[in-house]
């Protein structure tokens, strides 16, 4: 039998890092066992579900390289199928109509709260007669459909990550609501637990891999599987992603959507690589920089941790920097030029673009770093305090800069390269007894306004080609 795994997101918001990590684990295991990775959009919440969120989720998965193997299914198009299965449960006696009103439920919960009891339905309408049901309907009362849960029953399964898990029926909050309210003998819109079971069975899902916050849902769903005589899938519950304080990562932790990671300048390969290690570890890793294809060959659900996985920004940044360092120069240049275009910066040539990309590549952590690191080569950089202090620290500082201007003009150099740059530097050192350290620091301050920066000779070439090297040096005398 072909193995099927799935991601079943609700399109009520942007693709979240937690959903993306769940998708990744499903995708990796599907590839490992030569199965299929499927998508089901759980869009039955008419009020909150939006098509633009569906588009965002699918685009985000594509961006991460998580391709799916069949056309995505929309749960909202299968409502009539779900209702038919609810009818089957009603006919078999596994479910019943419950006419308890919202106010009655609130009263019940208030009493339970005062008594220190957890919220739990009292199943008061489980054994209504046909006559009583007709009477409620004639009174215009609406009803939900509830699934009977035997409080004495024990639900257990062998979780692929957590081992054996047991639940007692009495801990599931009373009989489970399968549908929203409806009048007369109608069945309201089916709810999550029923729809999930029916659709997973329809899609021949063999492995359900999802977050640990679904464990209680799994216990309820197993009972529905059995009531409908469906074959149970294998279950695996992944650990939550935690923030630095050990709490569940949420929107309050600023960056959580895949779009935000993309905007910040993370590469999809790097983010996917990092997410794989959020809750999973490889035995005897030769490297932490692995492609999805490489990870899929060694990925196993049994190696996923039970404990929550703390999100580590430093680790993600390091992984991203490694991917930038090994990126082909022309490809990285294309990314960087988009930032230049957004800033309205124009470069002198495509060759110059590649030179600047090569210069800053190894110091970049995020793609967006290209803005700050490229800026001095387009716009006169502001003189920082340490630069101003250095310019006034020794008379040799400004003297060395005057000599640079002199030799540039004497040799009529309009385009600096590494050869004529070194020739000028050597002349100043030999002819004017200026120490090389003073000379190089002076030139760096002129170019960058501070004592740090990328390779000086390569930088000089770029400044010269963009015709701002002389203005940068001359400003030191103003």
From Swiss-Prot:
Transmembrane segments: none annotated. GO terms for molecular function: ATP binding; glutamate-tRNA ligase activity; tRNA binding; zinc ion binding. It catalyses: tRNA(Glu) + L-glutamate + ATP = L-glutamyl-tRNA(Glu) + AMP + diphosphate. It holds the Pfam family Anticodon_2. It is found in: Cytoplasm. SUPFAM superfamilies: An anticodon-binding domain of class I aminoacyl-tRNA synthetases, Nucleotidylyl transferase. ATP binds at residue 251. One of its GO terms (biological process) is glutamyl-tRNA aminoacylation. A motif ('KMSKS' region) lies at residues 248-252. InterPro entries: aa-tRNA-synth_I_cd-bd (IPR045462), aa-tRNA-synth_I_codon-bd_sub2 (IPR020751), aa-tRNA-synth_I_CS (IPR001412), aa_tRNA-synth_I_cd-bd_sf (IPR008925), Glu-tRNA-ligase_bac/mito (IPR004527), Glu-tRNA-synth_I_codon-bd_sub1 (IPR020752), Glu/Gln-tRNA-synth (IPR000924), Glu/Gln-tRNA-synth_Ib_cat-dom (IPR020058). Its EC number is 6.1.1.17. A motif ('HIGH' region) lies at residues 9-19. Keywords: Aminoacyl-tRNA synthetase, ATP-binding, Cytoplasm, Ligase, Nucleotide-binding, Protein biosynthesis. GO terms for cellular component: cytosol. PANTHER family: GLUTAMATE--TRNA LIGASE, GLUTAMATE--TRNA LIGASE, MITOCHONDRIAL-RELATED. Catalyzes the attachment of glutamate to tRNA(Glu) in a two-step reaction: glutamate is first activated by ATP to form Glu-AMP and then transferred to the acceptor end of tRNA(Glu). Belongs to the class-I aminoacyl-tRNA synthetase family. Glutamate--tRNA ligase type 1 subfamily. Monomer. This is Glutamate--tRNA ligase. The gene is gltX.
């Amino acid at each position: 039998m072909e193995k099927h795994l799935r991601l079943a997101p609700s399109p009520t918001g942007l693709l979240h890092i937690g959903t993306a990590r769940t998708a990744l684990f499903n995708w990796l295991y599907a590839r490992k066992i030569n199965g299929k990775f499927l998508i089901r959009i759980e869009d039955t919440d008419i009020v909150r579900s939006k098509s633009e969120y569906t588009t965002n989720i699918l685009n985000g998965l594509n961006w991460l390289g998580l391709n799916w193997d069949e056309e995505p299914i929309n749960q909202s198009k299968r409502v009539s199928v779900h209702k038919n299965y609810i009818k089957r449960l009603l006919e078999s006696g596994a479910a019943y109509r419950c006419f308890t009103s919202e106010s009655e439920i609130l009263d019940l919960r208030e009493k339970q709260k005062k008594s220190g009891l957890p919220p739990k339905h009292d199943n008061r309408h489980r054994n209504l007669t046909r006559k009583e049901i007709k009477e409620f309907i004639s009174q215009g009362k609406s009803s939900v459909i509830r699934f009977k849960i035997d409080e004495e029953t024990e639900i257990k399964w062998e979780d692929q990550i957590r081992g054996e898990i047991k639940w007692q029926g009495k801990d599931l909050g009373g009989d489970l609501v399968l549908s929203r309210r409806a009048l007369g003998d109608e069945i309201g819109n089916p709810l999550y637990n029923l729809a999930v079971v029916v659709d997973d069975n329809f899609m021949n899902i063999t492995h359900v891999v999802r977050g640990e916050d679904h464990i209680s849902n799994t216990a309820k769903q197993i009972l529905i599987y059995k009531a409908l005589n469906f074959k149970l899938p294998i279950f695996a519950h992944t650990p939550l992603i935690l923030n630095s304080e050990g709490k569940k990562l949420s929107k309050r932790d600023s960056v959580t959507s895949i779009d935000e990671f993309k905007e910040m300048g993370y590469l999809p390969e790097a983010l996917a690589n990092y997410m794989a290690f959020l809750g999973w570890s490889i035995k005897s890793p030769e490297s932490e920089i692995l492609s999805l294809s490489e990870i899929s060959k060694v990925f196993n659900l049994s190696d996923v941790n039970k404990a929550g996985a703390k999100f580590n920004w430093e680790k993600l940044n390091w992984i991203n920097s490694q991917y930038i360092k090994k990126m082909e120069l022309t490809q990285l240049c294309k990314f960087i030029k988009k930032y230049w275009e957004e800033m309205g910066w124009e470069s002198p040539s495509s060759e110059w673009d590649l030179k600047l990309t090569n210069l800053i590549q190894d110091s970049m952590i995020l793609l967006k770093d290209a803005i700050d690191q490229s800026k001095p080569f387009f716009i006169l950089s502001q003189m920082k305090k340490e630069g101003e202090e250095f310019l006034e620290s020794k008379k040799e500082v400004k003297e060395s800069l005057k000599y640079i201007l002199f030799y540039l003009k004497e040799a009529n150099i309009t385009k600096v390269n590494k050869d004529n740059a070194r020739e000028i530097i050597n002349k100043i050192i030999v002819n004017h007894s200026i120490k090389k350290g003073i000379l190089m620091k002076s030139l760096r301050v002129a170019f960058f306004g501070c004592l740090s920066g990328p390779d000086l000779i390569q930088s000089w070439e770029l400044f010269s080609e963009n015709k701002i090297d002389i203005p940068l040096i001359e400003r030191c005398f103003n």
